[in-house]
Amino acid sequence: MVAFTIEQIRGLMDKVTNVRNMSVIAHVDHGKSTLSDSLVQKAGIISAAKAGDARFMDTRKDEQERGITIKSTAISLYASMTDEDVKDIKQKTDGNSFLVNLIDSPGHVDFSSEVTAALRVTDGALVVVDTVEGVCVQTETVLRQALGERIKPVVVINKVDRALLELQTTKEDLYQTFARTVESVNVIISTYCDPVLGDVQVYPQKGTVAFASGLHGWAFTVRQFANKYSKKFGVDKEKMMERLWGDSYFNPKTKKWTNKDKDADGKPLERAFNMFILDPIFRLFAAIMNFKKDEIPVLLEKLEIQLKGDEKDLEGKALLKVVMRKFLPAADALLEMIVLHLPSPVTAQTYRAETLYEGPSDDPFCTAIRNCDPNADLMLYVSKMVPTSDKGRFYAFGRVFAGTVKSGQKVRIQGPNYQVGKKEDLFLKSIQRTVLMMGRSVEQIDDCPAGNIIGLVGIDQFLLKSGTITTNEAAHNMKVMKFSVSPVVQVAVEVKNANDLPKLVEGLKRLSKSDPCVLTYMSESGEHIVAGTGELHLEICLQDLENDHAGVPLRISPPVVSYRETVEGESSMVALSKSPNKHNRIYVKAQPIDEEVSLDIENGVINPRDDFKARARILADKHGWDVVDARKIWCFGPDGNGPNLVVDQTKAVQYLNEIKDSVVAAFQWATKEGPIFGENCRSVRVNILDVTLHADAIHRGGGQIIPTMRRVTYASMLLAEPAIQEPVFLVEIQCPENAIGGIYSVLNKKRGQVISEEQRPGTPLFTVKAYLPVNESFGFTGELRQATGGQAFPQLIFDHWQVMSGDVTDENSKPGAIVKEKRVRAGLKPEVPEYTEYYDKL
């Protein structure tokens, strides 16, 4: 146990080479929080008696009840290394005490925006994988997110006790399971890896994979055992590590190493990993769980484990826990792996600077980030808001990338839409206090240098969810985070008692602050809408809203899915609209954009802020666009970054650039509320073919052009086979064989289509993957559990948009019925308008 004073931590913060910022990421229920507990216990923040069941990181009541992590929380740990260990660190270090900032993030798919926020402020990730279940859909998603942020992973294979106690595997089987898991992690890493990072695949023989049991509180790496044996046999430790994994065998008769699994007489030899590492563990388990009273003391003496007075009377699982914790304490193995193999901020910011900073990569601010310089101008990124213990206020939670942040310092608070030299989305305020985040509590601290994670008090009124804090007006923003999920399920919320309305409005503001991936807005008909990523996410948001943020009883409508409007063909004729004063005309055609281009826009590969030549290059080389068109993209819409484009195909039009702003504004408006039923548009490209403008500037102002452009966009879309797209979930279900029939029947009932079904080798479990329209997903979990007797556990994650087949104008078709219902609910005429409503004759 380490007794912390704030001064000691503050001292460690200055040695940035000895800081490690890391997050724990994994699939739901693979045991992140339990592992984090054993780390926290080592750093001396909770008492040893409670670890394992304390779930210290789960700070919220509902997290402890549901047994899942919802928000990500941060904690500082202290690790001290022996001089021998420090020698093995491949980067610059200073002394042998280390500060580890640990962020535990949720594994449940619906909360993956929380994971993104946690990843942005860290440099390394501890990826937890369940021995029995292996790599699942969410493991892959979070690992992909981490590699996209240029974060270096190390792996923990958790729940080894399950394999030993539940499945009773043999040593060789267990080795094969481990090897398979490591392999599948490396496949994902090599697929998504950024060349700048170099090879970040994980290898047990290099010490970047640990094997653990979070519940029992023990863990080991190959390196630890190599340490023990190299001292015992006087062999070189590095050589020993290589031999303790893979196909190497020790022949006890000849005392020689070999890579063949049989000796000279053809007798099978035992793999070194099994013989030297698994054997002592298996023996302990066998002796203790079979209550062999006489064997236990002999084994303990051999392994140099001493039991205290009352521990000698324990037996069974309780004794097993105590012994394994003494033999292989989890925190030692994990902290050693974190300190040895994860980068310090100094190392990481050299290659992460360009992905973090929006401005030019050679300006002084990017250079300061690259050098992690505590004396430069302040660059701090706030990744999310954390509610304080007194209701209604938030800590801004973020990381200092350059400079030093102090209490009472005057700073510039730049929201996500801020641009250098402009005034919007910018506040000049001073920071009231800087605090250290410690899980459930916070500690006040005077200042915090570059490379560390910090909480700020007093700026929550000026930031919505995330933003950049600097002290220099020339500094650009840090790049906005990319969320891998989008809010597609929405409900309308109203108060039961009309007097409570102001509280609801205030509560909605707070809710959207505290969760990075929730959308709250007011619809045209005056309803308050809350949109989330899935059923569970929405349920928790609404529960938060009712109990904490608004604190008033609410009425909640049944959930509705958001759709997208699109076109499937090119406009059948050129659409034309005239301005209200009849002096200006715009001629356009609409056509669909390929799904791949839309995805690239949504994932930020094709970016509206990029240089137009670079953007044209990608479009021409990767997607086969005409270069001239690709250079003349006027804007992306809606919100300036959506997957719809205006392309200027006009030839020699006078005054054209004067109306560009009006056209862009109109297009944003038209794509935000499409012609079919007022939803966002997606994958629509509008080509401006010709424009006739009045010679007098006064007759072609915004008031003339904007409505015209909006009408002509609508007309061209209605002429181009309009259709709607619905969101589709990717479902992953793990279940035993006898439950598969039930799964198929539920999926068929809900328009689902199965894409793969495979058995996990070495287990009786099957993994079924399927596409399920979000529209049909409500109550899916419940029905699935009924049909399979509670054996199937689904994971839903938003995957893609898919066009609904059928005519939108025919109310008897499936999409037509959806359109009609939505139009009636929004108070529009039930029929989809004809194109003639927006089309003007010459």
UniProtKB/Swiss-Prot annotation:
GO terms for molecular function: GTP binding; GTPase activity; ribosome binding; translation elongation factor activity. Transmembrane segments: none annotated. It comes from the Eukaryota. Catalyzes the GTP-dependent ribosomal translocation step during translation elongation. During this step, the ribosome changes from the pre-translocational (PRE) to the post-translocational (POST) state as the newly formed A-site-bound peptidyl-tRNA and P-site-bound deacylated tRNA move to the P and E sites, respectively. Catalyzes the coordinated movement of the two tRNA molecules, the mRNA and conformational changes in the ribosome. This is Elongation factor 2. NCBIfam families: small_GTP (TIGR00231). The modification Diphthamide is found at H699. Belongs to the TRAFAC class translation factor GTPase superfamily. Classic translation factor GTPase family. EF-G/EF-2 subfamily. Signal peptide: none annotated. Keywords: Cytoplasm, Elongation factor, GTP-binding, Hydrolase, Nucleotide-binding, Protein biosynthesis. Disulfide bonds: none annotated. Gene3D superfamilies: 3.30.230.10, 3.30.70.240, Elongation Factor G (Translational Gtpase), domain 3 (3.30.70.870), P-loop containing nucleotide triphosphate hydrolases (3.40.50.300), Translation factors (2.40.30.10). Has antigenic properties. It catalyses: GTP + H2O = GDP + phosphate + H(+). Residues 17-346 form the tr-type G domain. It is found in: Cytoplasm. GTP binds at residues 26-33, 158-161, 213-215. PROSITE patterns: G_TR_1 (PS00301), G_TR_2 (PS51722). Its EC number is 3.6.5.-. One of its GO terms (cellular component) is cytosol. The keyword DNA-binding does not apply. CDD domains: aeEF2_snRNP_like_IV (cd01681), eEF2_snRNP_like_C (cd04096), EF2 (cd01885), EF2_snRNP_III (cd16261), EF2_snRNP_like_II (cd03700).
